[in-house]
Amino acid sequence: MGDIIRIKRHHYVHILDNNTNVTRCMVGPLVYTRKENERCLFNPKPCIVVPPRFYCIVQNPCVRDASGNPVIGENSSVMLRMGEEEICFEQEPFPLQPGEVLKREEEEWLFKLKLIPVNTGYHVRCLCDFTDKNSVLRRAGTEWLVEGPQTYVPRVEVEVLREVHAHIISPNTALHIRALVKFTDRTGVPREAGDLWTVRTVGAYLPAVEEDVIGTFQGITLTDTEAVHLEALSNFTDVYGKRRRAGERWLVTKEDASIHIPDVHEKVSGKVRAIVLNEKEYCVVQNPLGADGLNEFGRKEVRKGECRFFLHPQEELLGGMQPINVVSKDQALLLQAVDFFDDNGKIRRPGEKWMLHGPAEYIPDVNVRILEQRNLIALDKNEGIYVMNTTTGVVRVVIGKPYMLNENEVLWEKDLSPKVEELLAFANGCMSEGERNPSFKSTRVRHRVVRFNVQHNAAVQIYDYKQKKLRVVLGPNLVILSPDEEFTVVSLSGGKPKVPNLLHCLQLFLGPRFSSDRIVVETSDHARLELDLSYNWYFDVNREEPDAKIFSVPDFIGDCCKTIASRIRGAVAAEDFDSFHRNSAKIIRVAVFGRGENGEINTSLRFSANNLVVTNIDIQSVEPTDAKTRDSLQKSVQLAIEITTKSQEAAARHGKERKDQEARGKLERQKLLDKIEVERTKTKWLQLQAQSEAVQASGQSVAEAKAKAESLLIEVDSELKQAEMRAKAYRITAESELKKQKQKLELELEFTKRQNELDIMKARQIAETEAERVQRMVNAIGRETIVAVAQAGPEMQAKLLGGLGLKGYLITDGKSPVNLFNTAQGLIDAGSSAQEHS
């Protein structure tokens, strides 16, 4: 760089004096001659230009006087405020004094002023004390909000912490605000740190720096069927002007507001639906709200329809909405008082029961409990129920008429043993041990009377354990048990040989019936035999006065079979095998029935203990128990059977041969008789054949002549009939053609006649129409008008010719004929005119 420094306009250089080590700034336009002890630190630089709406930050700015010029210190150097910053806005281009530095961010030193839009603000904080342009003293650490819309002018004493956006409060919404420090809000209300409040003003809300927005809360729409329960979080006055205490709960409905926005001091406990009762419904509300607005805990209230209401907080709906108890004439309600109350003038005590009979509609009082609804129990003449009086404990049977229990009665269930229950499930009341079902469950209605149909010729024993009496019922009959009666179950032996308790019955069959048994006996020669026996028996009972004696032996079948088997064994033991084998039936009958005084075998065996009578015994089979004896006996029996069979076969064979010989003789004799009859028939046939040939020969010529004559006669008759038919057809054709022509002519004549009549009628109508038209025209125009029109033409012609000086005119081309009539008319007109003039 030379000694001469040319500095352009708005440019500057820094000159260092090496002697004093002081740098000064030179601003153009200027031509500066550098001294020997001076040095130019850099080539001329353009001055700092800050365009509109921009700014720059100068670090270590120089100290300026009141006129804005840099202050020079004692050593002739520019005084600087070291460590400080200065913001330069739009102004004339200026140079950087020695020591000043432009603050750069991301290599940029020129910054654009920021715009604060509508509903936005800058949260700023003061870094050091200063007084702003409004003469407000700002202390270090003070924070405030710069609201838009405006251009934010930065200061070195203020830093921007964040950008704050407004919260939009739409209709039916609100903001919950909390105070961070003690301050006075923009509405002039003083707030303490931690205070909460609600902002409901619709629009944009820009929170102050001392405020914290908890959130936006949507309003709750309240309808006729929906309300809301609220709970106070602290003591406050709600939006409806009511003072609320912390923990208090209340109801807000549509009558209070159509939309409720929850306050910051309250919370929504829940939404409730309206309870709508029609005229046939009611409900019970527990802990209802009293007149003082407080719940009356422990009290109940009945609300009847038609109505609509909301449950207040801590109110409970017991049992939901319930229909009114409709009691028909065949029904009743069993009611019980739970507390003292006045029932239409009658004092009811706690625990007291009474019946409400229909027909009626009943809504229970809060002090009344409905125990049950009872219906009239319909009973046939053979049906009944067990009824117990709860006061006395007496159980009785009601049979044959509809019955309604009173307040002191209940249906009593009669319990029966499982065996009896299972026997009642069988039609005849009997079952074998193998038919028992271990998982059987009775379907009997226990409060219904126990009934059992006793079959014909059967008996049932019933025991009354209260009176300790027995009664026997003979069938056919219907047994109905009283509350203290039980059936006597009969357990009998069964099977072959007899097994005890194999058969169980409710009824005892009186017979006659039969039983089978299998016993083993031993003869005197020690042959053991197995006998299959059947007995016929019956009970000898007086049907007028049946005796319980027949039930005195529990297992009469087993007892009878044992007695008979004992007698048979004793009798067989005294006989050898051959003797018993030949006379087994007689020996057994004598052993069982015994002999009478006259030595004859008795016909029956009577058991006096129960009047059982055995009338007959049948030996079904006798078999040795020893295998060898049984085989030898079978062989001997088989041999005897074979001998008998062979003798019977020989006798049958001899009889067959004799019958065959007799049959062959009869057959030969019949053959001879048949041959004689054939020859006789053949002779008769030959005679008839000869007669037929003679008749055939004589009758052939006569038949041919008759046939030809008949053929000719038929042809002549046929031609005659054809001629008659043709003549008849021709006559019919001619008559039809004549009739057709006649009808055609008549139709044409009628058509012509009608057409002529129509033409005449048409002409007449046209003439009448024309005459009427002319008449109407004449009437419309008038007689004078017609005369004037008729005279107008000649007068005009006369005037025209007079004007031309002519008396008349005739124009022709020599080819057209001359209208002499018009000429004559003109002459006449002219003559008449002359006469008029004369």
Curated annotation (Swiss-Prot):
MVP repeats lie at residues 13-52, 53-114, 118-170, 171-223, 224-278, 280-328, 329-380, 381-433. The keyword Protein biosynthesis does not apply. Keywords: Cytoplasm, Nucleus, Phosphoprotein, Repeat, Ribonucleoprotein. Its main location: cytoplasm. It comes from Trypanosoma cruzi (strain CL Brener). Required for normal vault structure. Vaults are multi-subunit structures that may act as scaffolds for proteins involved in signal transduction. Vaults may also play a role in nucleo-cytoplasmic transport. This is Major vault protein. The keyword Phosphoprotein applies. InterPro entries: Band_7/SPFH_dom_sf (IPR036013), MVP (IPR039059), MVP_rep_dom (IPR041139), MVP_rep_sf (IPR043023), MVP_shoulder (IPR021870), Vault_2 (IPR041134), Vault_2_sf (IPR043179), Vault_3 (IPR040989). The vault ribonucleoprotein particle is a huge (400 A x 670 A) cage structure of 12.9 MDa. It consists of a dimer of half-vaults, with each half-vault comprising 39 identical major vault protein (MVP) chains, PARP4 and one or more vault RNAs (vRNAs). GO terms for cellular component: cytoplasm; nucleus; ribonucleoprotein complex. It is found in: Cytoplasm; Nucleus.
